[in-house]
């Protein structure tokens, strides 16, 4: 499997509970390496832009409110099959359906406060990385 990069986000519901280190450790323990990371407090415009794909969905307003409610950690992860590996470590979107030992099973509060986001494909990984990072901020 090829070395690839993916985008990862630790959401405000997790940062407010001081889970940044615990979640990052789970990612690193699975063989992913953090090659870029920063703490941001999303503006409404940034959240609406990042989640524009969901703008017509009924949960969009609640999503934007949640993402602007506190600090977020945005990261670029690197490793073999990083996109799929990150998705597996995160677990199902609904923590009730997530496998034991996944980030969402261990740390998520609900489907809306599910602690993390990760890219689902190479194209979205590239877009999401570019949304938050310049090339000079990614050091690996």
Swiss-Prot record:
According to UniProt, the reaction catalysed is: a 2'-deoxyribonucleoside 5'-diphosphate + ATP = a 2'-deoxyribonucleoside 5'-triphosphate + ADP; a ribonucleoside 5'-diphosphate + ATP = a ribonucleoside 5'-triphosphate + ADP
One GO molecular-function entry = metal ion binding
Do you know which InterPro entries this protein is assigned to?
NDK-like_dom, NDK-like_dom_sf, Nucleoside_diP_kinase, Nucleoside_diP_kinase_AS
Origin: domain of life: Bacteria
Q: Which residues form the active site?
A: 117
Record's keyword terms, sorted: ATP-binding, Cytoplasm, Kinase, Magnesium, Metal-binding, Nucleotide metabolism, Nucleotide-binding, Phosphoprotein, Transferase
Detail the disulphide connectivity of this chain as listed in its UniProt entry: none
| One Gene Ontology term from the biological process aspect of the record | GTP biosynthetic process
Q: Which GO terms describe its cellular component?
A: cytoplasm
Listed Pfam families: NDK (PF00334)
The protein's enzyme class: transferase
- Per the UniProt entry, the Enzyme Commission number(s) are 2.7.4.6
According to the record, the segments passing through the membrane are none
Q: How does it assemble?
A: Homotetramer.
Show the HAMAP family listed in the entry: NDP_kinase
Q: Which family does it belong to?
A: Belongs to the NDK family.
Purpose: Major role in the synthesis of nucleoside triphosphates other than ATP. The ATP gamma phosphate is transferred to the NDP beta phosphate via a ping-pong mechanism, using a phosphorylated active-site intermediate.
Its recorded name reads Nucleoside diphosphate kinase
Species: Rhizobium johnstonii (strain DSM 114642 / LMG 32736 / 3841) (Rhizobium leguminosarum bv. viciae)
Lineage, top ranks: Bacteria, Pseudomonadati, Pseudomonadota, Alphaproteobacteria, Hyphomicrobiales
Give me the gene this protein comes from. ndk
């Amino acid at each position: 499997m090829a070395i690839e990069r993916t985008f990862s986000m630790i959401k405000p519901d997790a940062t407010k509970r001081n889970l940044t280190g615990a979640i990052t450790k789970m990612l690193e323990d699975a063989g992913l390496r953090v090659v870029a990371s920063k703490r941001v407090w999303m503006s409404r415009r940034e959240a609406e832009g990042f989640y524009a794909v969901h703008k017509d969905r009924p949960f969009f307003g609640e999503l934007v409110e949640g993402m602007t409610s506190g600090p977020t950690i945005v990261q670029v992860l690197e490793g073999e099959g990083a996109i799929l590996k990150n998705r597996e470590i995160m677990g199902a979107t609904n923590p009730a359906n997530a496998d034991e030992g996944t980030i969402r099973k261990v740390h998520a509060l609900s489907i809306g406060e599910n602690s993390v986001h990760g890219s689902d494909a190479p194209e979205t990984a590239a877009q999401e990385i570019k949304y938050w990072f310049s090339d000079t901020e990614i050091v690996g």
